[in-house]
Amino acid sequence: MLSRQALLRPARVLNTQVRTYAAAAAASSKVKPPVTLFGLDGTYATALYTAAVKTSALEPTAKAISSLGNLLAKDPKLASILETPTLSPADKSAIVAELQKSVGVSNETVKNFLATLAENNRLGLLPSVVAKFSELMSAARGEVEMVVTSAQPLDNKTLNRLESAVAKSPYVGSGKKLKVTNKVNADIIGGLVVEIGERTIDLSVSSKIAKMNKLLSEAL
């Protein structure tokens, strides 16, 4: 876990090569992202994707960004540090250097991307940019995200059975592959809530109780 002291210690301002990154992204007009993203975080994610394609470094970039996502998930305090509005140029340089060191980034595209965020005072966007970049990669790989919400964690056997059943259904297009995630929410009491792309199948106990309560209230 990164400490605040480690991130904010005095450091030399990095030679960021921001212009190199911007030029690579701008020159990628012939690269068409698999999906259109909106918002400032979507703009940065798309620029990173197109720059990575242009420099033939898409998979290494995806691996590095995934590592950054894991780091951010394990260290919630890091996000608040990134959002600090009073960071000096030296602080930003130190943060970028520590992020690169922590995830073992040697990819120039990612280095320049992080430097660009720092240069533009947008390091606070990093968590959402990572999420948006993941959307781009899933679309590029032909993946359909399936989120299974349960009251308790599901074992791999159960998840595999669900994946096999849904993969054969009309919910998943031909040639697509499922990317399964299990989320835990005790509020659903029992059962499952399955989200496939933009579709939701609510088989939770809480949903059934809500429907029953509605029927009872209408009958009274």
Curated annotation (Swiss-Prot):
Predominant cellular place of this UniProt entry's protein: mitochondrion
Protein name: ATP synthase subunit 5, mitochondrial
Gene3D superfamilies listed in its UniProt record: N-terminal domain of the delta subunit of the F1F0-ATP synthase (1.10.520.20)
Pfam families in alphabetical order: OSCP
Keywords: ATP synthesis, Hydrogen ion transport, Ion transport, Membrane, Mitochondrion, Mitochondrion inner membrane, Transit peptide, Transport
BP term (GO), one: proton motive force-driven mitochondrial ATP synthesis
Organism whose genome encodes this protein: Neurospora crassa (strain ATCC 24698 / 74-OR23-1A / CBS 708.71 / DSM 1257 / FGSC 987)
Domain of life: Eukaryota
Subunit structure of this chain's protein: F-type ATPases have 2 components, CF(1) - the catalytic core - and CF(0) - the membrane proton channel. CF(1) has five subunits: alpha(3), beta(3), gamma(1), delta(1), epsilon(1). CF(0) has three main subunits: a, b and c.
MF (Gene Ontology): proton-transporting ATP synthase activity, rotational mechanism
PROSITE patterns named in the record: ATPASE_DELTA
Entry function: Mitochondrial membrane ATP synthase (F(1)F(0) ATP synthase or Complex V) produces ATP from ADP in the presence of a proton gradient across the membrane which is generated by electron transport complexes of the respiratory chain. F-type ATPases consist of two structural domains, F(1) - containing the extramembraneous catalytic core and F(0) - containing the membrane proton channel, linked together by a central stalk and a peripheral stalk. During catalysis, ATP synthesis in the catalytic domain of F(1) is coupled via a rotary mechanism of the central stalk subunits to proton translocation.
Cellular component terms (Gene Ontology): mitochondrial inner membrane; proton-transporting ATP synthase complex
Source lineage: Eukaryota, Fungi, Dikarya, Ascomycota, Pezizomycotina
